């Protein structure tokens, strides 16, 4: 290799050495005239402008040769940095000669920058800050900030103007020869070429002593070429290539999603990974996945080669490689052993929360599709209609241990967002267990009494009884560990054949489940046992049928089992529940036929009645009794009521064994609205602009739609599709911003010692409970002890964790407000403490120090974002203002924007004396008489008032319906009230859409929103007025000054 060292090819002048140098060696262009760096001149705020105290516009005129700037005023009446036009410059030159100096372009700016005395500027600015106010003060703070940064870093301001431009190595701006002798090249080469050409031309012009105006023009063009190279399009029109496409400059190579950082450094492709279509693997255990053999051979290739050599099945690595390529028998045997105990990671994009990547143990399967356990589909939000997933192999022992201990799918049973099971049976598994636990009166063999489960099984197999038959069984024959009382054990228990089989899959000492109630999860009621000598058939004749176990109840069972037995037993139960569900749903033969969609006799009558009501409303409008918007509102309400009536009647007419009804009732698939559209009426549709159309679709899918109805229907359907696509992108972007804000919030210590807390009560919307007190206090630490109001018994002590049992007792005692430790009142710097956070929702245990709760919070809020609606409700202007809901409302809150449909907040406590309407400018004026002063507020005429004349109102309350602005709340009240408001508002949006999120996640985000303070008066600290800083730094600065005696 050394043989050719230093030799240069005499044909093309290239050194003979390794090709790697094409990625390392840089060149440079020595410029014939300095050029300003566009980042420092055009950035916001303009760094050059701040250092020189010139406006960016003036700077631009100088740099691009439109004006002269005075660099040395000498003994003239001019001042430094004064701008002169061409004409003024000539006149002054004629008048003063060489007594002053002025220049143009980056050269002049470079001179000005080198004249700046940084130390002196710092002293002057600090003096200015003591007296300046308003905008002057803001400007001074900004200048001081940047000049101090220059002083601290040791950089010189004149370095913002370049004399030399570096050229990046050739391999980073490649040039490729295409067929036909043409070349494809990186845009950077074009941009560099422009700079070189203009620089060479300028050099030549300078050597020829060309006229000043030509040189100036060439310098300006060089400046523009350098600008385009660094950041094309930042100033003026971008330089374009063929087909009018803007060229990609150095800045574009770095920034954005496709830039160097996000695309290539954070988003590298990794080896030992693959992707394939996924298919369902009902035969798998909870922590397994099916890996196709060809994929396994490729992913585990080095491991297989090592093992082949180790077992002497191949002489060396090369021979082992050949064996693998030939698919030898030996290789298959070795593969089985290699993948044993070696977990792999499965990921499905988009990875919205941490359950989007989980670890599994691979099991070899035939075919080319990876097999996924049906219960983890919900966490991945995967289905099997062609979804693909990526697989990664952890290589090092540490990575494998981490995958096994922390990421194995069997351990992720609860969702981090709300602590409810995310691994729960769905679809076939639900319908199977629903069918199994259904009871029917009068089925064959009803009232038979059996000795034990085996006898029941034999009777069922020989068709003496049906799964739905209600029977009796000797309780003593059931597992001795079941928590029956001694009296219950001595009696006969009433249950159904299916429920007996279902209870077989539960842990041995779990209560026998006979009815889907919360109480039955803890103990079985005495009413299911026969009195000695009682006739079972007579008892059954008067006993109503118990409902079957639906999806929600199966989830409750899992949650209860997880609480008592933790991970291992729960994952075993889940597998048993899955197998039983698949078996029984297959045996049940449930299906959907056109006969299941029954006609509704009362429909024509309901529709006719609605038409009459609409005609009446239209008549009232024509007579001028109501406005157009009122007419529209009423018509919409009439048709909605008609649809609701039809739905109600359909439910009444349902046969309990109707297959579609069973699917919807069990929670397996579909809901009552789907059924209404099949058998009732399609209802109102949204127009493309989001407004609801007055003409409903009266037909249902069974009858078939008319052409016009079909046209309306496609309108609504298309809007739904576009909304979903937009929502996904919006929600993903919101998650990214939330993570960005909260990623450094980590549990730092056990107890911060905070003596403050947050008073919580149920979140209400009118009379509707949005989030109960039980949910809000569960898994939190109490800040103050809670006592039973009647007896005075202590329910929970100070700094004690509120468990399910304690929370239940608090609710039963009738307590409505509890003071809890909260992230809002936590004193921990750069994070939260264990006590202020409480329970980790994903494990059900107290959170551990080091847990990244900020990221979990951001993911928990962002992940359900796709389920929120996109629309701002267009009410047709009836309620005055359109209210923002769904995802846009959540973004509005977290970005602290001025809300749409703003509610006015009163700044005084007092009485509403008058509400006057001004029809001329369509406003209302509300006057409030406080104790010391009177305030008048102007509201739009269409506002819905929350107060009337004579009402007493407190400071910080709203006068009209709508969303309060958090920025106003913080001014009128305090930070705690603002943080509380953010939690309430975000919860309202999510809960209205049926999405449950734990308060603590929103608290973490709200705390981050209010972390920064702006220094108004620095006092005796070293802080600069107007600077934004972290509240912890602010406290430290104050404490430090106090300790020094300030």
UniProtKB/Swiss-Prot annotation:
Q: Where does Zn(2+) bind?
A: 752, 826, 833, 836
Gene3D superfamilies registered for this protein in UniProt: 1.10.132.30, 1.10.1790.20, 1.10.40.90, 2.40.40.20, 2.40.50.100, RNA polymerase II, clamp domain (4.10.860.120), RNA polymerase Rpb1, domain 3 (1.10.274.100)
Keyword annotations: DNA-directed RNA polymerase, Magnesium, Metal-binding, Nucleotidyltransferase, Transcription, Transferase, Zinc
Which Gene Ontology cellular-component terms appear in the entry?
A: DNA-directed RNA polymerase complex
Q: Which GO terms describe its molecular function?
A: DNA binding; DNA-directed RNA polymerase activity; metal ion binding
- Which top-rank group of organisms is this from? Bacteria
Cofactor, free-text remark: Binds 1 Mg(2+) ion per subunit. Binds 1 Zn(2+) ion per subunit.
Please name the HAMAP family in this protein's record. Answer: RNApol_bact_RpoC (MF_01322)
Q: Which family does it belong to?
A: Belongs to the RNA polymerase beta' chain family.
Q: Please give the name of this protein.
A: DNA-directed RNA polymerase subunit beta'
Q: Which organism is it from?
A: Weissella hellenica
């Amino acid at each position: 290799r050394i043989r050719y060292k230093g030799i240069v090819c005499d044909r093309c002048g290239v050194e003979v050495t390794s090709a790697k140098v094409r990625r390392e060696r840089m060149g440079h262009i020595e410029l014939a005239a300095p050029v300003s760096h566009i980042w420092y001149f055009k950035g916001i705020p303009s760094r050059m402008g701040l250092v020189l105290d010139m406006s960016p516009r003036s700077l631009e005129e100088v740099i691009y040769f439109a004006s002269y700037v005075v660099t040395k005023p000498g003994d003239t009446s001019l001042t430094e940095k004064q701008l002169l036009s061409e004409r003024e410059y000539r006149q002054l030159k004629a008048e003063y000669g060489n007594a002053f100096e002025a220049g143009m372009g980056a050269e002049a700016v470079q001179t000005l920058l080198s004249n700046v005395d940084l130390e002196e500027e710092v002293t002057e600015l600090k003096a200015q800050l003591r007296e300046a106010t308003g905008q002057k003060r803001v400007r001074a703070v900004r200048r001081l900030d940047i000049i101090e940064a220059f002083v601290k870093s040791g950089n010189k301001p004149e370095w913002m103007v370049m004399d030399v431009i570096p050229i990046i190595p050739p391999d980073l701006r490649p040039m490729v020869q295409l067929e036909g002798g043409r070349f494809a090249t990186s845009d950077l080469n074009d941009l560099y070429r422009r700079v070189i050409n203009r620089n060479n031309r300028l050099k030549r012009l300078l050597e020829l002593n060309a006229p000043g105006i030509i040189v100036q023009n060439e310098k300006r063009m060089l400046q523009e070429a350098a600008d385009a190279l660094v950041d094309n399009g930042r100033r003026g029109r971008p330089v374009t290539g063929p087909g009018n496409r803007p060229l990609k400059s150095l800045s574009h190579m770095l920034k954005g999603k496709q830039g160097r950082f996000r695309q290539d450094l954070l988003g590298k492709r990794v080896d030992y990974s693959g992707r394939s279509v996924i298919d369902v693997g009902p035969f798998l255990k909870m922590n397994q996945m099916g890996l196709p053999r060809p994929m396994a051979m490729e992913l585990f290739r080095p491991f297989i080669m090592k093992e082949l050599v180790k077992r002497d099945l191949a002489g060396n690595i090369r021979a082992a490689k050949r064996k693998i390529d030939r698919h030898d028998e030996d290789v298959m045997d070795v593969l089985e052993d290699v993948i044993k105990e070696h977990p792999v990671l499965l990921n499905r994009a988009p990875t919205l929360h941490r359950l989007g990547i989980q670890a599994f143990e691979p099991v070899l399967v035939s075919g080319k599709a990876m097999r996924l356990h049906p219960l983890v589909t919900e966490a991945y939000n995967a289905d099997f209609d062609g979804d693909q997933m990526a697989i990664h192999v952890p290589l090092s022992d540490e990575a494998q241990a981490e995958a096994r201990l922390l990421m194995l799918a069997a351990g992720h049973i609860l969702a981090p967002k709300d602590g409810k099971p995310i691994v729960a049976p769905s679809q076939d598994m639900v319908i199977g267990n629903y069918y199994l636990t259904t009871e029917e009166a009068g089925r064959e063999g009803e009232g038979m009494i059996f000795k034990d489960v085996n006898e029941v099984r034999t009777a069922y197999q020989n068709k003496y009884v049906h799964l739905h038959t209600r029977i009796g069984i000797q309780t003593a024959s059931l597992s001795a560990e079941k928590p029956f009382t001694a009296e219950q054990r001595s009696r006969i228990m009433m249950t159904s054949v299916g429920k007996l089989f279902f209870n077989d899959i539960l842990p041995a000492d779990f209560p026998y489940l006979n009815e889907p109630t919360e109480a039955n999860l803890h103990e079985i009621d005495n009413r299911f046992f026969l009195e000695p000598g009682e006739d079972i058939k007579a008892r059954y004749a008067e006993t109503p049928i118990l409902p079957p176990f639906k999806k929600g109840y199966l989830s409750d069972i899992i949650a209860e089992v997880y609480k008592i037995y933790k991970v291992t037993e729960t994952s075993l139960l889940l597998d048993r529940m899955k197998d039983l569900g698949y078996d029984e749903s297959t045996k049940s033969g449930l299906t959907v036929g056109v006969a299941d969609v029954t006609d509704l006799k009362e429909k024509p009558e309901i529709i006719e009645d609605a038409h009459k009501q609409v005609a009446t409303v239209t008549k009232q409008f024509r007579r001028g009794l109501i406005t157009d918007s009122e007419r529209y509102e009423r018509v919409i309400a009439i048709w909605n009521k008609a649809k609701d009536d039809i739905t109600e009647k359909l439910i009444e007419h349902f046969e309990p064994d109707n297959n579609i009804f069973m699917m919807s009732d069990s929670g397996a698939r579909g809901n009552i609205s789907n059924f209404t559209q099949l058998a009732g009426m399609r209802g109102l549709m949204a127009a493309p602009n989001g407004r609801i159309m007055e003409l409903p679709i009266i037909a249902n899918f069974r009858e078939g739609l008319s052409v016009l109805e079909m046209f309306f229907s496609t309108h609504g359907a298309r809007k739904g599709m576009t909304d979903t696509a937009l929502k996904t992108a919006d929600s993903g972007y919101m998650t990214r911003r939330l993570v960005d804000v909260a990623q450094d919030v980590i549990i730092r210590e056990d107890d911060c010692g905070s003596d403050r807390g947050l008073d919580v009560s149920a979140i209400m919307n009118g009379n509707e409970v949005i989030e109960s007190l039980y949910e809000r206090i569960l898994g939190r630490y109490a800040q103050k002890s809670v006592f039973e109001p009647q007896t005075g018994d202590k329910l929970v002590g100070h700094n004690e964790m509120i468990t399910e049992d304690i929370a239940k007792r608090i609710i039963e005692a009738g307590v409505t407000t509890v003071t809890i430790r909260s992230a809002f009142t936590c004193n921990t710097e750069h994070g939260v403490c264990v006590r202020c956070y409480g329970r980790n929702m994903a494990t059900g245990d107290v959170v551990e120090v080091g847990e990244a709760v900020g990221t979990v919070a951001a993911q928990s809020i962002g992940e359900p974002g796709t389920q929120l609606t996109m629309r701002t409700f267009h009410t047709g202007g009836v309620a005055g203002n359109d209210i923002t809901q769904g995802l846009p409302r959540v973004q509005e809150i977290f970005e602290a924007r001025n809300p749409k449909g703003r509610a006015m907040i009163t700044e005084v406590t007092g009485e509403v004396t008058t509400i006057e309407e001004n029809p001329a400018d369509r406003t209302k004026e509300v006057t409030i008489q406080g104790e010391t002063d009177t305030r008048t507020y102007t509201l739009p005429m269409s506002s819905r008032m929350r107060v009337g004349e004579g009402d007493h109102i407190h400071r910080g309350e709203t006068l009209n319906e709508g969303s309060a602005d958090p920025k106003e709340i913080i001014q009128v009240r305090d930070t705690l009230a603002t943080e509380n408001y953010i939690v309430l508002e975000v919860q309202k949006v999510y809960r209205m859409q049926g999405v449950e999120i734990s308060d603590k996640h929103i608290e973490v985000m709200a705390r981050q929103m209010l972390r920064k303070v702006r220094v108004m008066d620095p006092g005796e600290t070293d802080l600069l007025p107007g600077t934004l800083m972290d509240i912890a730094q602010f406290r430290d600065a104050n404490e430090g000054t106090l300790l020094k005696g300030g």
